[in-house]
C-alpha cells in the first residue's frame, strides 16, 4: 500500500509502502472496545473509600437499654441507620487494572490505525524537527487539513517541537513508544513520521 510522504509545508516529497497487515486490517469494534476499556481501567486511581463501622470514631457503648424504652433496639451509634454512621457495601481502595492478552492489544492498535487509514485521516510526515520555536508554523501546517484534532507520533521530539505545539489545544504530541488505541481514537487525524511507521511495523509484526 503506497502512501504519500509530506513535509512541514504540506508538500509531497515522496511515497512510502505501508504494510497491509498493520494499516489495512478489517474493522473490529469488539476488539477496540476491549482495548479501550482495558486502558481506562488501568487509568483509574482506585482511591475511592467509604468508612465502614470499624473506621468511624466514636463510642462503642450501647446507646440505651435493650427494653422498656418504646424505641427500636440499637447496639451502636455508628450503625448505618444513624446520621454519621457507617456505609454498607461502600467503595474500598482497590486496583481496577486487569490483564489483557498481548495479541489482543496488538490487534487493537492495528485496527485503530487501519480505521484512520481507511477514512483518509492518516498522514505520513518526513520529520518534525525544527530549529526554533514557532507556533505559527505548526498552526499553518494543520490548517491545510480539514480535521478537528491532530495526534503527532514521532520517534522522539525536541524541545522546540514541544514548545511550538503546547499552546494548541487540538494538537497532541506522543512518542512512538506510547502509541495507544485510546489516543488514536480520540483524535480526528493521526500524523506519523517515517521513523514512527518503521517502529510500529517492527513492534506489531
Curated annotation (Swiss-Prot):
Renumbered residue ranges of the record's region Disordered: 56-78
UniProt keyword RNA-binding present: yes
Entry GO terms, CC: ribonucleoprotein complex; ribosome
Keyword Disulfide bond found: no
One Gene Ontology MF term: structural constituent of ribosome
Domain of life, source organism: Bacteria
Gene Ontology BP annotations: translation
Entry keyword set: Ribonucleoprotein, Ribosomal protein, RNA-binding, rRNA-binding
Purpose of the protein: One of the primary rRNA binding proteins, this protein initially binds near the 5'-end of the 23S rRNA. It is important during the early stages of 50S assembly. It makes multiple contacts with different domains of the 23S rRNA in the assembled 50S subunit and ribosome.
NCBIfam families, A to Z: rplD_bact
Family of this protein: Belongs to the universal ribosomal protein uL4 family.
PANTHER family found in the cross-reference section: 50S RIBOSOMAL PROTEIN L4, LARGE RIBOSOMAL SUBUNIT PROTEIN UL4M
Subunit structure: Part of the 50S ribosomal subunit.
UniProt xrefs under HAMAP family: Ribosomal_uL4_B
Record-given protein name: Large ribosomal subunit protein uL4
Taxonomic path: Bacteria, Pseudomonadati, Pseudomonadota, Alphaproteobacteria, Rickettsiales
